[in-house]
Amino acid sequence: MSSYFVNSFCGRYPNGPDYQLHNYGDHSSVSEQFRDSASMHSGRYGYGYNGMDLSVGRSGSGHFGSGERARSYAASASAAPAEPRYSQPATSTHSPQPDPLPCSAVAPSPGSDSHHGGKNSLSNSSGASADAGSTHISSREGVGTASGAEEDAPASSEQASAQSEPSPAPPAQPQIYPWMRKLHISHDNIGGPEGKRARTAYTRYQTLELEKEFHFNRYLTRRRRIEIAHALCLSERQIKIWFQNRRMKWKKDNKLKSMSMAAAGGAFRP
């Protein structure tokens, strides 16, 4: 054993100077000193602490024997009044494992009892709340059915009153007289202003009949205009406009013809 290890042990504990090792040859004196120190320090540090083990890593042929170690551990165990399950040896190589307690000997702690009691109370309260919720839902369903029956009664009474009352007569259609209708309907008003008149496209038969009538008489009377309008399925206004346009064209043609004839006659004048 080195003096450095012993000096460090003496400086760590308050009663270290009382247990300085001066005799390195006597095994019994050294074991007795360490046995007393273990018994004194075990109560101070708790859990069966038996001081510092100075025989770590030593073989059986070292300074301390196995019998001395057994006696020192026995003295430390008798000095420590702690329970066997709380005793912790310094090293696992010098003391056996404590026997585990049987399951029957382990009594439930009051904390676990209170925990189980809290769980039971929670389960009971949840069951009571579920029962209350079911009764509340059933009561609400009962109220809903009652209110639905009350709502059905006024609806049926309203239907009966509606059936008993006579239905109002539909509004009469306004009567349309013949002069209100358009005789010649054209769909050329798309995209144009409302007051603009659409261009009327005449058929070949209508144009031929109008040309023959214009050849006989360039001006029409009111009676003849009505006859032509009924014969050609046209309106009087359309007949009048066609004759106006045809006369303008005839005057233009005659004017050009007369101007050309006058120009031709002046050229041949000597």
Swiss-Prot record:
Coiled coil: none annotated. Keywords: Developmental protein, DNA-binding, Homeobox, Nucleus, Transcription, Transcription regulation. SUPFAM superfamilies: Homeodomain-like. GO terms for molecular function: DNA binding; DNA-binding transcription activator activity, RNA polymerase II-specific; DNA-binding transcription factor activity; DNA-binding transcription factor activity, RNA polymerase II-specific; RNA polymerase II cis-regulatory region sequence-specific DNA binding; sequence-specific double-stranded DNA binding. Gene3D superfamilies: Homeodomain-like (1.10.10.60). The keyword 4Fe-4S does not apply. It comes from the Eukaryota. GO terms for biological process: anterior/posterior pattern specification; bronchiole development; cell migration; cell-cell signaling involved in mammary gland development; embryonic skeletal system morphogenesis; epithelial tube branching involved in lung morphogenesis; intestinal epithelial cell maturation; lung alveolus development. A motif (Antp-type hexapeptide) lies at residues 176-181. Residues 75-87, 119-134, 154-166 have a biased composition (Low complexity). Belongs to the Antp homeobox family. Sequence-specific transcription factor which is part of a developmental regulatory system that provides cells with specific positional identities on the anterior-posterior axis. Also binds to its own promoter. Binds specifically to the motif 5'-CYYNATTA[TG]Y-3'. This is Homeobox protein Hox-A5. The lineage of its organism: Eukaryota, Metazoa, Chordata, Craniata, Vertebrata.
